[in-house]
Amino acid sequence: MPQMMPMKWFLIYFIYLLIFYLFIMLINSMLIKTKINKETLKIKLKKWNWFW
């Protein structure tokens, strides 16, 4: 049993890293989308301010 423990922990750690990496990828894609949206929002706001 003690010899099996490190392997188990390694697997848990590996799965955790994989999930974390996927989560970072997801956040990055979301940030890119929001950046594009923010740029369009800024342009809209500038037009709106200019109109006022």
UniProtKB/Swiss-Prot annotation:
Q: How does it sit in the membrane?
A: Single-pass membrane protein
Instruction: Print the keywords alphabetically.
Output: ATP synthesis, CF(0), Hydrogen ion transport, Ion transport, Membrane, Mitochondrion, Transmembrane, Transmembrane helix, Transport
GO BP term, pick one = proton transmembrane transport
Q: Where in the cell is it found?
A: Mitochondrion membrane
Q: Where are the transmembrane segments?
A: 7-27
Q: Which domain of life is it from?
A: Eukaryota
Q: Name one GO cellular component term.
A: mitochondrial membrane
The job of this chain, per UniProt, is described as:
Mitochondrial membrane ATP synthase (F(1)F(0) ATP synthase or Complex V) produces ATP from ADP in the presence of a proton gradient across the membrane which is generated by electron transport complexes of the respiratory chain. F-type ATPases consist of two structural domains, F(1) - containing the extramembraneous catalytic core and F(0) - containing the membrane proton channel, linked together by a central stalk and a peripheral stalk. During catalysis, ATP synthesis in the catalytic domain of F(1) is coupled via a rotary mechanism of the central stalk subunits to proton translocation.
UniProt family annotation:
Belongs to the ATPase protein 8 family.
Assembly with partners or alone: F-type ATPases have 2 components, CF(1) - the catalytic core - and CF(0) - the membrane proton channel.
What is the official name of this protein in its record?
ATP synthase protein 8
Q: Which organism is it from?
A: Apis mellifera ligustica (Common honeybee)
Recite the lineage of the species. Eukaryota, Metazoa, Ecdysozoa, Arthropoda, Hexapoda
Recorded name of the encoding gene: mt:ATPase8
